[in-house]
Amino acid sequence: MVFRIASSPYTHNQRQTSRIMLLVLLAAVPGIAAQLWFFGWGTLVQILLASVSTLLAEALVLKLRKQSVAATLKDNSALLTGLLLAVSIPPLAPWWMVVLGTVFAVIIAKQLYGGLGQNPFNPAMIGYVVLLISFPVQMTSWLPPHEIAVNIPGFIDAIQVIFSGHTASGGDMNTLRLGIDGISQATPLDTFKTSVRAGHSVEQIMQYPIYSGILAGAGWQWVNLAWLAGGLWLLWQKAIRWHIPLSFLVTLALCATLGWLFSPETLAAPQIHLLSGATMLGAFFILTDPVTASTTNRGRLIFGALAGLLVWLIRSFGGYPDGVAFAVLLANITVPLIDYYTRPRVYGHRKG
């Protein structure tokens, strides 16, 4: 009798994978709804574009690799990759950007490594970082939330801007980005970093319309709370574990609090970090990716804490306003090392 020894993972339950991915997609509904409310229909258009391009890219690669297309697409992982990238980019970014990002994410960051379960890096964040480095202007051209916006594009206008760069009336991104103060708006994190470097005091910065929210940036605080609600539902459904989100948020809050106490004139307050940018999206939907995150409980705590520290460092001292994507990828690099030193000890093993 011949016994075959295969490398892990030893089981692969496609039905279970499909169910978890579907739960994550459902949990994203509150966050998507909040982004639609505050930033307009462009988010929905980007999600549709990303979904189609990820499915087509995955199907093409599977066909070339002579693997079952229908069976693999049913695991919903391609849809989730497209969704995460679509909600991470500005809602009126040119159509070709989300297509390029999703195709790169699926073909290079996922299928090139062997497909789902083999990729060491989060595919959606690879796609996002490629776009951010290649097209920094377009990737940082966020619209002001509707509560401080002058021009709010409708569904048809959003489609026209995404595909042609202009609305039917001739408006462009520069016009649509104007806030109630007549100044082009950026995200709370981007505004803070730019203003501090320009020599503005924190007291002055907090008077800007973008910070008119109750807790943090206008619109962004509610978007983050919506992603938090979806994340808590995932925990309740046991689709994700608590270790990574908790250690990530606690570390980010702790670093932000200490930094703010020591340098309140140059560093953002903790609520700005927690309720702006992609904080809650990253904590519950990106870092918890079971393929690219640590697989032990202690490892998950270390992994989340490392990502939280990196996000704060990049936001506070780096060249980019939001460091979630870079933090995720840098933390992904450390996963083999973390798992090696945190794996459970074999029963009966003694220290040498």
Curated annotation (Swiss-Prot):
The modification FMN phosphoryl threonine is found at T187. GO terms for cellular component: plasma membrane. It is a multi-pass membrane protein. Its EC number is 7.-.-.-. One of its GO terms (biological process) is transmembrane transport. It is found in: Cell inner membrane. The chain crosses the membrane at residues 20-40, 42-62, 89-109, 123-143, 214-234, 242-262, 267-287, 301-321, 322-342. Its cofactor is FMN. The complex is composed of six subunits: RsxA, RsxB, RsxC, RsxD, RsxE and RsxG. Belongs to the NqrB/RnfD family. Part of a membrane-bound complex that couples electron transfer with translocation of ions across the membrane. Required to maintain the reduced state of SoxR. This is Ion-translocating oxidoreductase complex subunit D. It comes from Shigella sonnei (strain Ss046).
